């Protein structure tokens, strides 16, 4: 047996010891805890709005904090800001690169950002004096594609990249303040905690990591998926996270218990997950799939309680409004749908 093999076995044994130690700390399972709870009734949601205007696949969307406006990014090379009440386009921003993979709305509503295969994060000012939307910053230092970006405020944004790193940027100077290193595969997704002090990332190494924005350190690593993690989100209270993977499952991890609580999957679901988001209470989990559907899960009972079907192609992105009143899905069929 080679030295490499010996070390590999040793590492596996240590991993098992850690898993056993974590299990020993758990005083109760989620299933036991909610055994007396009724399952949420059938969740039937209707399409209230269809946003038409993109001419190609939609890759990303993000709600503004006002729960009215949203930004979407498409392969047609446009970033569109929509008024979801009227379905009007507030801004249609032509991009320098049409290979866009992510977009984000600043909490203030003043800026939007996007990026993709150009390896850059472009910041657009929606409130410029001239009234026209133009690039205010291009943040370039990543050596791989930009997979996700999220604002902390008007001067700070966090990005994840195919170069396996995440980064915190000072938008004013255009410089990286902190680089978050630790993943061993392409970083696919990130989400910021409700208090903006932490963020989580999911990667192609099948792990999720919790990072401290100020300290620049990795606090926790969560494993369990058998394939790439494509999507990640915080539970509304910030004390748990959910991941969506190509292994056809979503998983719920508790930050305080430092371990997986449950998985959301069914034998009939064999395709990957592209996007995840919780309802305002956290009781419902919305997950977008490659099979054109969005499944609604009871997050506590781990049962599927609804399906949002209305797209003719992969559901690539979704999001729940800050006020919890609506969920938006975006698809490769070039449409966005607003449900409630």
UniProtKB/Swiss-Prot annotation:
Keyword Iron: no
GO cellular component: a single term: heterotrimeric G-protein complex
Entry-linked SUPFAM superfamilies: WD40 repeat-like
Its job: Guanine nucleotide-binding proteins (G proteins) are involved as a modulator or transducer in various transmembrane signaling systems. The beta and gamma chains are required for the GTPase activity, for replacement of GDP by GTP, and for G protein-effector interaction.
Residues spanning the signal sequence: none
Molecular function terms from GO: GTPase activity; GTPase binding; spectrin binding
Pfam families in the record: WD40_Gbeta
PANTHER family with a match to the protein in the record: GUANINE NUCLEOTIDE-BINDING PROTEIN BETA G PROTEIN BETA
Keywords associated with the record: Repeat, Transducer, WD repeat
Name of this chain's protein: Guanine nucleotide-binding protein G(I)/G(S)/G(T) subunit beta-3
